Design a protein with these regions (language model features):
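Short beta->alpha connector loops at strand-helix junctions that form conserved
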Residues: 28-29, 49, 71-72, 88-99, ...
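Phosphate-binding beta-alpha-beta segment of Rossmann-like dinucleotide-binding domains, i.e.
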Residues: 86-88, 94-142, 150, 154-157, ...
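Short, polar loop motifs at secondary-structure junctions
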Residues: 9-14, 170-175, 259
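Short, conserved active-site loop motifs that form the nucleotide-linked donor/cofactor pocket
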Residues: 23, 88, 183, 272-274
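Rossmann-like dinucleotide-binding domain for NAD(H)/NADP(H)
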Residues: 90-91, 223-312
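Short glycine-/small-residue-rich Rossmann-like dinucleotide-binding loops
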Residues: 51, 73, 196, 201-204, ...
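Rossmann-like dinucleotide/phosphate-binding beta-alpha-beta segment
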Residues: 21, 131-222
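An N-terminal-biased, well-structured beta-alpha scaffold segment characteristic
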Residues: 1-91, 213-215, 219
Length: 312
């Protein structure tokens, strides 16, 4: 018997034929919330990205559902409490996008510190802005990494290649684990006070909602730079906007927003903000890894085999 798996947001091409032979994949990319409620009942598992919401209402009608797979890291679009109540296993693919998000973070950092987007737009407008665009170096700057999981650690390693000093705050990882990478473990408050650049790599959960708020910004160095390619909601966007307007924050580079897309929100429109449309995992390699990893993990869960990335 083949496991019947619903794909709500597509899946990268899988080359493992044995894995494919064990499942029946039904691709319903772009399925609406209403259609999902109507169609999910026959499926043993569903694989989603960030767009599709797996709510208590969905789980209530999904009588055959055994597993929810999240292609990527964040599971804030899945009601984990409801999944546990319904006896549905939730798994993700947390390492598949690590390299891509880490590389984007460094790209945003370099773009911000050297004013690369402004230089490019100036050239396209026929303006030679050489004298106006005086940046600074990453060399010997203090990078504060909030969240030292797979991505945070990968960012730290790449930053060290630029001879940056890396300090890190993570409430879960031990000081020895952080030190082993070459970073200095510090408290959240100390990180805010010492960092020249702050980059965030944490999930958006109750305890991290608006972690960077007015109080946090008040503790930071003047002219600090903020990078976030994690999840919208971990930064209070109004507080960041106020800090940019006051000059406390010299610039920010954001790949994620509280509301996506952010529309005409003034934050991504600010002249000292570089914005990208949540493209951290949008590379060919990351999507291939994520597709294989999540399908393998979902099938393992259905077969009741040991799991690498079980959430609930």
């Amino acid at each position: 018997m083949k496991w019947k798996i619903l794909l709500t947001d597509g899946l990268a091409k899988i080359s493992d034929q044995a894995l494919l032979d064990s499942v029946e994949l039904v691709d319903r990319k772009g399925i609406t919330a209403e259609e999902l409620l109507e169609e999910i009942d026959p499926f043993d598992a569903v694989i989603v990205r960030g767009r599709t919401k797996i709510t208590d209402a969905v789980l209530n009608v999904a009588k055959n559902l055994k597993v929810v797979g999240r292609m990527g890291v964040g599971v804030d679009n899945i009601d984990l409490k409801a999944a546990k109540t319904h006896g549905v296993t939730v798994v993700n693919a947390p390492v598949a996008t690590t390299v891509s998000v880490a590389e984007l973070t460094l790209g945003l950092m370099l773009s911000l510190i050297r004013g690369i987007p402004k230089a490019d737009s100036g050239m396209k407008a026929g303006n030679w802005l050489k004298k106006q665009l005086r940046g600074t170096e990453l060399y010997q700057k203090t990078l504060g990494v909030i969240g030292f999981g797979h991505i945070g650690e990968s960012v730290a390693k790449r930053a060290m290649a630029f001879d940056m000093r890396v300090i890190a705050f993570d409430p879960i990882r031990s000081e020895d684990e952080i030190k082993a990478v070459g970073a200095e473990p510090v408290s959240f408050e100390e990180l805010l006070k010492r960092s020249d650049i702050i980059t965030m790599h944490i999930p958006h959960i109750k305890s991290t909602h608006h972690l960077l708020d007015d109080k946090a910004f008040s503790l930071m160095k003047d002219q600090v730079l903020i990078i976030c390619a994690a999840r919208g909601g971990v930064i209070d966007e109004q507080a960041l906007l106020a800090a940019l307007e006051s000059g406390k924050v010299a610039g920010a580079a954001l790949d994620v927003y509280e509301s996506e897309p952010p529309g005409t929100h003034p934050l991504p429109m600010h002249p000292n903000v570089i914005g990208t449309p949540h493209i951290g995992a949008q590379t060919k390699e990351a999507q291939l890894r994520a597709g294989f990893d999540i399908l393998s993990e979902v099938v393992a869960a259905l077969d009741q085999k040991p799991l690498r990335w079980k959430i609930v």
